[in-house]
Amino acid sequence: MLYIYIKTQNALVQRINFNLDSQELPQNILWIDLLHPSAAEIAFISSEFNLEFPTKEEREEIELSAKYWEDNATITINAHFLVRDLKSDEEDRNLIKLRTEIVTFATAKNILFTIRYNEFSTFEEIQARILASPKNFEDGFDIIDKMFEVRVEKDADLLEWIDKEARRLRTSVLEKKDEYSYDEMLKDISSLQELNMRVRDSLFDKRRAMTSLLKSDKIDKDIKQNLTIVLKDLNSLVEFSVSQLNILDNIQTILASQINIEQNKVIKIFTVATVAMMPPTLIGTVYGMNFKFMPELELHYAYPIVLGVMVISIILPLVVFKKKGWL
C-alpha cells in the first residue's frame, strides 16, 4: 500500500491512497509511505525517483555502512524500531514484550520515502501532526527530524517503565514480600535486563543515524539544531540505561544473597537435627547388640529408662545450641 502526502495550494497536507493501476503521481509530494509494499510498488517508486532501495538482506545487516549511506542526491537510513506488546500473565502482572522492526528511510528531491512492514504508533503520531500542523513540515527532512524525536521520547517512556519496575522489585526484595517467589523475581530481573539492553541498542542505532545526519550538507541549519538537542537527550538516556543496569545487578546480588541465606538456614536445620539424633542413635545401637550378657536388660524398668535417656540426649544438644545462638 502506498500512502502519499502532498502539499496543497492552501498550505495544507492531503493524504491519498495511491493505486499503481489507475493513478499518476501527484505534484508537490512531501512523503511517500510504503506499508507492506509489493515488489511492483517498490520497483515503480525506484524507477520514478531514481532510487535504489535496500533488499531484505541489506536491511538486516549490522555493519554501519548498511545502516546509513549517502550520495550526491539521496540519503538512505535503515533504522531499528522497538515495537511494544503489552501482555498479562496468569497473575495479572503487566509484562512488556518488545520486538525489533527495521524501517527504511530514504530522501530524494526533499521527499521522504519510508518502507515498513508493520504498523507503528510513531508513524500514526507523525501522520496526525502533519495533517494538524502542515506548516511545521516543509520537506521530508522535517519529517525525519520529528520521527527521531518521537522515537527517542518513546524509548524514554520505556526506560521510565523499567525504572519503576526495578524500584518495585528492589522494595519487594529488601522487604522480603511473599507476593512473588524467588524464581519469579529472578525471571523479572532477567526480563528487565533484556528490555534495558534492547532499548539501549535502539538508542545506539538512532545515535549513529543522527550523528551521520548532522554531518550531511543536505540538512538545513534549523533541523541540525533540533537534532543536536534530541541527540543530547538521547545521550542522557544512554547514561540512564547504564545506571539502570547497575541497579538491576545490585538487586540480583541482594536476591542471590537472600537465597544463600535461606539455603544456609535449611542446611543448618538438617545439621542440628542430625547432631541431635546422634546420641539416641548410639544408645539404640548399643542396646540393639545381641550380646549374651547384658545385665541391665533384665531390669523391670530398663525400657522406659533407656527411652528417657534417649529423649534427654536429644534435648541436651538442642539446649546447648540454643545457648550458643546457633538456633
From Swiss-Prot:
The question of whether Metal-binding is a record keyword is answered with no
**Motif Probable selectivity filter positions after renumbering to this chain:** 288-290
Transmembrane segments in this chain: where? 269-289, 301-321
Q: Which reaction does this chain catalyze?
A: Mg(2+)(in) = Mg(2+)(out)
Q: Name one Pfam family in it.
A: CorA
What is its membrane topology?
Multi-pass membrane protein
Q: What's its job?
A: Mediates influx of magnesium ions. Alternates between open and closed states. Activated by low cytoplasmic Mg(2+) levels. Inactive when cytoplasmic Mg(2+) levels are high.
Regarding domains, what does the record say? The central ion permeation pathway is formed by the first transmembrane domain from each of the five subunits. Mg(2+) binding strengthens interactions between subunits and leads to the formation of a symmetrical homopentamer surrounding a closed ion permeation pathway. Low Mg(2+) concentrations trigger both a conformation change within each subunit and a loosening of the interactions between subunits. This results in an open ion conduction pathway. In addition, this results in a less symmetrical shape of the whole complex.
| The protein's assembly and partners | Homopentamer. In the absence of Mg(2+), interactions between subunits are weakened, and dimers, trimers and tetramers can be observed in vitro.
- The entry's protein name is Magnesium transport protein CorA
This protein's encoding gene? corA
